[in-house]
């Protein structure tokens, strides 16, 4: 039986996307899956579906800050929360970063994983502004891209090709029924199965016939 294609639609402004990203990376050599990263734009999904940021409901915002801290510890992902996180999110557009990630995916896909991880590290661990070109270039070079490749990707973000690719990927997520991120789509038994949230990966395993071994599984020997 062939590997099950599992697509992860994500935006680096979403901390729960980071949790799903890291856990799926851990499982890709344990489960019989073909993991595909699909950088998309959360702002576009929120706008198209009429979804609202969690902080719009104060009590929910308070809960999420506590939940994120617990989840980060449980998933062993270095998300560092602070009281001003929602203000940082509302004051930061991830569009430039996601276009840069998309441009890199189109030209040098081998850097997609480390680059995405580096953006999460900078926004959620180091609390940097990932919308600024100098921080974007620094993230790219930390992820292994040369100065030349980084500059080329930065120049590409304003091109119709990159803009259209990001729009298309976001539209695909919406087509599958996404209303937020992370959106995980498993192509199993002849149809797509959508899972929303980093806490649905155990259910994903159940649907595709794989065993859940916790968020930090021991790799196969």
List the model feature ranges, each with a label:
Residues 12, 18-126, 215:
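Structural alpha/beta surface segment adjacent to cysteine/selenocysteine redox centers
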Residues 4, 13-16, 20-33, 114, ...:
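C-terminal cap of thioredoxin/glutaredoxin-like
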Residues 7:
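Beta1/beta-strand and adjacent pyrophosphate-binding region of the FAD-binding site
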